[in-house]
């Protein structure tokens, strides 16, 4: 039998269990400091370990992975699938249990991208977190404007528009006169709403309102700057290493350049990690769960999966369902007849992800499917249009 190791990783400690050919376990506790991980690596190599398995415990496994991947084949395991028997759970027994399952070939590894994709993923997920902060700051700025009775957000398309931000900046710099603030409003908005714009800018701004508004505005500008820095790094990696894949994904309706970078950061460009498109869809959390007992289906809700990938795929599906003339728009409208809009959107996202899998696997561009009608469908259409023609002729 192969010599393997199972690791139970915590914030400050790592419990390692090595199972050798004689099945006598070697168990030792290590520090999560870099020196401790290096010591762990040296010990495993000296005992002839080739494969190491560990649980995906939060972010604690990441630095351990970075050090050990230089010398070992690593397997990251979802803790849900290797639960210990109740009443027998200790750190040492957890490490021993992982090593035992690994030695018997019963572990299924999670997808861990290579170093380059991990870097791209860090930038992408950082951008998502900043986008959430941006939304919260926009809401904070709107609340503070309403407290001052500045109602320009009722007429602008969104809080982060150039018009609103120019007015906020002017207020922060001390300008409170409605006539001067009105000059900063986009001409189209002024022409459309006229006198209401002037009235919406006649607010009551206290010193405390100005201070809080200025703080929120400064935070907002910082977030926008940090977003641009992350996008610049994402652009660099994708342009240097994934230009063909970016071009292929861009041919799919509803997927723009930023969406393509996000998708690649989450799934990579090599589909060998996913045996079929169904595995990828399941990993993304876009397939119905199997919850059946005694012939009764209890739930068909989508499974928990990669929240970052599922989020961007639903956004792309929403855009594709509104792309005029696209196959996705027709399919979405067809599904909405018998399903809720939300379920139809998930179905479109699932279909898009299956297409992405095929494009990345075959290295081809997207070609819109041609609607092929069966003989019965053609006959029904002929009858329908013949009936409409008869109605028009009778009207004359």
Language model feature labels by segment:
Residues 1-396:
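A detector of single, family-specific signature residues
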